[in-house]
């Protein structure tokens, strides 16, 4: 896969404008410097919403056409904090090793 940070930043800017998340974090192999030719772009979107699955589908649909495969994880701040409070390894790794691409001001 040909990962292009400029194209990703443009996609994040559109996502931020349209959905106004609190944060967007790049995680996984591209963030951790361990990508392989089949790696997708993993994004964690933090937004206070009543239905994270519905929002994930909306965001997913808005990101077409895609220059590379994207895998989305949408969480509310409460979900994120609850999982951090129980030392959830996956969420802790996203926070500790991920790259913050967007934060609401």
Indicate where each model-derived feature is located.
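Catalytic core of pol beta-like nucleotidyltransferases
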Residues: 1-23, 32-37, 47-105
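Conserved H-loop
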Residues: 29
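Short beta-strand->loop micro-motif that forms the acidic, two-metal-ion catalytic signature
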Residues: 42-45
